[in-house]
Amino acid sequence: MFNRDMNIADYDPELWQSITDEVQRQEDHIELIASENYTSPRVMEAQGSQLTNKYAEGYPGKRYYGGCEYVDVAESLAIERAKSLFGADYANVQPHSGSQANAAVYQALCAPGDTILGMSLAHGGHLTHGSHVSFSGKMYNAVQYGITPETGILDYAEIERLAVEHKPTMIIAGFSAYSGIVDWAKFREIADKVGAYLFVDMAHVAGLVAAGLYPNPVPFADVVTTTTHKTLGGPRGGLILAKANEAIEKKLNSAVFPGQQGGPLMHVIAAKAVAFKECAEPEFAVYQQQVLDNAKAMVKSFLARGYKIVSGGTENHLFLVDLIAQDITGKEADAALGNAHITVNKNSVPNDPRSPFVTSGLRIGTPALARRGVNAQQSAELALWMCDVLDAIKDEAKLATTITAVKVKVAALCKACPVYG
């Protein structure tokens, strides 16, 4: 029998110290990685529940194990809430991650060796959109499209040309580092022209879509996937959505289980259900508007200080800072800002002369920043502090002094806007 007083701190103090250190880091550092967010105590409560003990292979009402009557309720709630949130007819809440959701879509709609057309990782796509280092680039004949380097905007004429030339089985729309608005209808038009499936990965903008602040791809795509963290702010996991299509729905269900996964993580599915309920609340839309406002405010500060923003601005939660003109690598910028307790990630920019391990840019996102209550004015000031660090990066002595000064400002901002009050 387990005693409910059992805890990690007493049993494994070494591990507990790493956990408490990370909790403190999250409170003391400003998080600007576009794919990261803070999840609610309610979501964490579900994830830490006894639902983790239950195996539930199959789907609600059709399981391969007994004793699933209560986890069926949790999964059914998650399914219905996801469908309602995004106006979908079908939802599969079982994928353990966005990448596994994407893998299931490939398995459902393509055969190994089929041609796919997706956004190049170097231009803002994702590993699973056909990168040669991913299963999507190894199992399938991946053709890649990108942005117009001069404008930073998707080149729809080039996408259409590639589609006509290569006749892909599936076209993938979506991104991990693109600050514009995607024209889902145009992608649908191109897919229809060549008889391809249209698969949209909206992992980065799902929260904005749920709040009505970014175009919803569900009415246009054959299949849509997303992660459930990032802008949605839920637990780490994946989600598949679709319009009513019995044949595709059956293929998707079979591709997730037994195709890609065995037993679903019922504690995480319960956490997804909680998160979807939170996303339907009016305050979630207010939060997403703050995400947008903060990103736009930061862009203005960077532009005012002479830094180039890929595409010239942002229409979502993220933007790319191009550091080529300053001869600063993304790697050294990432490290310097990290020393000032500002967490970002290095990122390639269009026509980047440096390797993906070094890069010439930074990807900056505001979901976590807005989550802790930071407003647009504070975000604009934060961006100026970041510019101070970047401006000093070539002068070791000046950089050390600047980092010390910025850390003091960051500490005050974090204290004024705690993650978990």
From Swiss-Prot:
Site (Plays an important role in substrate specificity): H229
Source superkingdom: Bacteria
Single Gene Ontology BP annotation: tetrahydrofolate interconversion
GO CC annotation: cytosol
Cofactor: pyridoxal 5'-phosphate
Disulfide bonds, paired cysteine numbers: none
Catalytically driven reaction(s): (6R)-5,10-methylene-5,6,7,8-tetrahydrofolate + glycine + H2O = (6S)-5,6,7,8-tetrahydrofolate + L-serine
UniProtKB keywords: Amino-acid biosynthesis, Cytoplasm, One-carbon metabolism, Pyridoxal phosphate, Transferase
Subcellular location: Cytoplasm
Gene3D superfamilies on file: Aspartate Aminotransferase, domain 1 (3.90.1150.10), Type I PLP-dependent aspartate aminotransferase-like (Major domain) (3.40.640.10)
Modified positions (N6-(pyridoxal phosphate)lysine) in chain numbering: K230
CDD domains registered for this protein in UniProt: SHMT
GO molecular function annotation: glycine hydroxymethyltransferase activity; pyridoxal phosphate binding
Residues annotated to bind (6S)-5,6,7,8-tetrahydrofolate: L121, G125, H126, L127, S355, P356, F357
Pathway: One-carbon metabolism; tetrahydrofolate interconversion; Amino-acid biosynthesis; glycine biosynthesis; glycine from L-serine: step 1/1
Function: Catalyzes the reversible interconversion of serine and glycine with tetrahydrofolate (THF) serving as the one-carbon carrier. This reaction serves as the major source of one-carbon groups required for the biosynthesis of purines, thymidylate, methionine, and other important biomolecules. Also exhibits THF-independent aldolase activity toward beta-hydroxyamino acids, producing glycine and aldehydes, via a retro-aldol mechanism.
Name recorded for this polypeptide: Serine hydroxymethyltransferase
Originating species: Psychromonas ingrahamii (strain DSM 17664 / CCUG 51855 / 37)
Gene name for this UniProt entry: glyA
